[in-house]
Design a protein with these regions (language model features):
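Phosphate/dinucleotide-binding and metal-coordinating scaffold of catalytic cores
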Residues: 1-173
Length: 173
């Protein structure tokens, strides 16, 4: 995808320098456009069917967005996203509040968390979280390389969880 976690991206044409800062730009969505975009996520995961490509791990529907003047926008071309937007998991309407409460609880005990908020586009609720693998400076953004423990330990993603042979806490430290 054009917008993968960290500093990895796949391009059909000439690759861009992923270490450079890029001016944040994108198409700002109206509330109605945002609601439609969110509601289409289960049918078009990871921007399938558009000229955008992104890669976000996990089973939950989500999309990568940029914030422009406190408005949600779809990033232009290969511009790194600033935030991840997640609707509720279908059939589990409280997942948005659950994620919000868990992160705020972590913050209360001194764990640093990214900026988060619960938003609403017409009748559609969403959870918005700022990306930790980005650096923003003077209105420009760049990707920060990161790896999860499976990547760092050369463990296939099929063994993501400890119960399936993935890394345990002892191996992480």
């Amino acid at each position: 995808g054009y917008d993968c976690a960290g500093a990895v991206a796949f391009f059909k044409d000439k690759p861009k320098n992923l270490k450079e800062f890029h001016r944040i730009k994108g198409k700002i969505l109206s509330e109605t456009e945002l609601e439609k975009y969110i509601n289409e996520l289960p049918k078009k995961p990871l921007a399938v069917g558009s000229d955008k490509r992104l890669s976000l791990a996990g089973a939950q529907d989500k999309t990568a967005v940029v914030m422009i003047k406190n408005k949600i926008a779809i990033p232009d071309d290969t511009i790194p996203s600033t935030n991840i937007l997640k609707p509720a998991i279908q059939g589990f309407d409280e997942t948005i509040e659950n994620e919000y409460i868990c992160l705020k609880s972590a913050e209360k005990i001194g764990i640093s968390i990214p900026k988060i908020e619960i938003g609403k586009a017409n009748n559609t609720k969403y959870f918005l979280i700022e990306r930790y693998d980005r650096e923003i400076k003077d209105g420009k953004i760049r990707r920060i390389h990161q790896e999860d423990f499976c990547q760092a330990s050369n463990i296939p993603s099929a063994y993501k969880y400890q119960s399936e042979g993935g890394v345990d806490f002892k191996r992480c430290i």
